């Protein structure tokens, strides 16, 4: 299992190799990409912030839950932090299983659970302003903690 929160670029090949197993007939990969618009507004860039140790712990819990729930052979969950430009990968999820149906289902579930539960916050930056727009629902936080809002 590969779990990482990092300011470094995410490498899909690393994740694929991490989950590849002889007994796995399928590998599914999801890349979350920074897009140039959101809700009709032009996005300049995004800034992701996290509590890395807590985020990795929660990512591991979610990945372990997926392994059992979907009978996976392995999984990888990687999330970027820091400033990300348009077109860069913010989230990488890879899963492997004996058959493709399990990987499709598990990948979808895993991405949704990571976005819902993992303490990572996203700030959207536009030409005329910025706003923290996402955080984990499970912590009851609508925006980043005060220590992160100043960045």
Task: Indicate where each model-derived feature is located.
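N-terminal, polar/charged subdomain of small-to-medium soluble alpha/beta proteins
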Residues: 1-90, 96-108, 112-151
């Amino acid at each position: 299992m590969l779990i990482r929160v990092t300011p470094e670029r995410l490498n899909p090949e690393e994740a694929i190799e991490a989950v590849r197993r002889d007994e796995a007939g399928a590998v599914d990969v999801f890349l979350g990409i920074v897009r140039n618009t959101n809700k009709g507004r032009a996005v300049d860039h995004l800034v992701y912030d996290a509590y890395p140790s807590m985020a990795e712990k929660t990512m591991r819990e979610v990945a372990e839950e997926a392994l059992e729930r979907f009978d996976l052979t392995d999984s990888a969950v990687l999330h970027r932090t820091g400033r990300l430009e348009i077109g860069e990968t913010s989230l990488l999820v890879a899963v492997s299983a004996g058959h493709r149906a399990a990987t499709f289902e598990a990948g979808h579930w895993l991405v949704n659970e990571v976005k819902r539960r993992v303490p990572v916050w996203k700030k959207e930056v536009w030409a005329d302003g910025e706003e923290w727009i996402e955080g984990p629902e499970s912590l009851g936080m609508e925006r980043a903690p005060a220590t992160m809002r100043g960045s």
